[in-house]
Amino acid sequence: MTKKTESKELPPFEYPEGYQLFAGVDEVGRGPLVGAVVTAAVILDPNNPIEGLTDSKKLTDKKRELLFPEIQEKALAWSLGRCEAHEIDELNILQATMVAMQRAIAGLNITPDFALIDGNKVPELPMAGLAVVKGDLRVQEISAASIIAKVTRDREMEELDKAYPQYGFAKHKGYPTKAHFEAIEEHGVISEHRRSFKPVKRVLGIE
């Protein structure tokens, strides 16, 4: 089976031949100083297309929120995986991302024939896999996974903001912004902060 996803800037993606069920996998949250790295795996239904899939970062919040339930409803299977802040500190962010991706794929209620991973590294998997640079723009399954992962993590940051409103998590989503740095300097770190990340280590005096 050969499918193509067209992009104005990138070459069309040629799906590997000889496979039927493709899972797209993407992550959100490698860069933030707080919270989990969240991954999603999605197997789309070719007979039930979803309009408007692209890299989640290129969509408005409103559009992501509209696509989120549509993907959940129309996909053949979808699953979330995650590594919490303490796991990131133990493993490092790259390895934690790989583990979270493994968890997302393992959670699918349909086993894919092939995993398409956004980026340039494939975790150890029980099926064939391929890393796709800019995959969230080139591969519909990865686009869908990026939307599921981002909406999920953004909602978690909004919940964390309710518990710790002084940090502004709903606005910066835990990323290393000036406002976040200032909040850490003033209020210290919380249990969800990643202690292995340099800005957090600096505040803790363990650099």
Curated annotation (Swiss-Prot):
Pfam families: RNase_HII
Keywords (A to Z) from UniProt: Cytoplasm, Endonuclease, Hydrolase, Manganese, Metal-binding, Nuclease
Localization per Swiss-Prot or TrEMBL: Cytoplasm
GO cellular component: cytoplasm; ribonuclease H2 complex
Claim: Cell division is one of the keywords in the record: no
Family from the record: Belongs to the RNase HII family.
InterPro entries given in the database record: RNase_HII (IPR022898), RNase_HII/HIII (IPR001352), RNase_HII/HIII_dom (IPR024567), RNaseH-like_sf (IPR012337), RNaseH_sf (IPR036397)
Keyword Hydrolase: yes
Gene3D superfamilies: Ribonuclease H-like superfamily/Ribonuclease H
All residue ranges annotated as the RNase H type-2 domain in the record: 20-207
Cofactor note: Manganese or magnesium. Binds 1 divalent metal ion per monomer in the absence of substrate. May bind a second metal ion after substrate binding.
CDD domains: RNase_HII_bacteria_HII_like
GO biological process, one term: DNA replication, removal of RNA primer
PANTHER family found in the cross-reference section: RIBONUCLEASE H2 SUBUNIT A (PTHR10954), RIBONUCLEASE HII (PTHR10954:SF18)
Chief location bin: cytoplasm
Biological source species: Aliivibrio fischeri (strain MJ11)
Enzyme Commission code: 3.1.26.4
Function: Endonuclease that specifically degrades the RNA of RNA-DNA hybrids.
Cofactor names: Mn(2+); Mg(2+)
Protein's recorded name: Ribonuclease HII
Catalytic reaction list: Endonucleolytic cleavage to 5'-phosphomonoester
Binding-site residues, a divalent metal cation: 26-27, 118
Enzyme class: hydrolase
Underlying gene: rnhB
An example Gene Ontology molecular-function term: manganese ion binding
